Amino acid sequence: MKVVNILEIADVNEALLNAGVPARVRLRDACGGQALWVEVSRGAVAEKDDAAVLAAAREVVGSYFAGRAKPVAFDDDGKSFRLA
């Protein structure tokens, strides 16, 4: 089973920052598995702009993990994701 490590979270968050996307990837890791999601920075954008920010974040996150042979699949909410 592929897993995401904390260094990858730091790297993907840096990639989001460098791309100008006001969002961060969050990781909750437990013995039952990992939960990953994108969190939009509330101070940076209005709630009505969440969809555009999430779309940009999905692009950056998808590209980052695909480059590491760890493609991701986003859930219907557009925020939560897992390794595919």
Model-identified regions with their sequence ranges:
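Short, solvent-exposed secondary-structure boundary motifs
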Residues: V12-A19, A55-A66
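Short glycine-rich, basic-tinged beta-strand/loop micro-motifs
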Residues: L27-K48, D76-S80
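Acidic, low-complexity, intrinsically disordered interaction modules
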Residues: S41-V61
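N-terminal acidic leader/helix
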Residues: M1-A30
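Charged low-complexity stretches with an acidic bias
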Residues: E59-A84
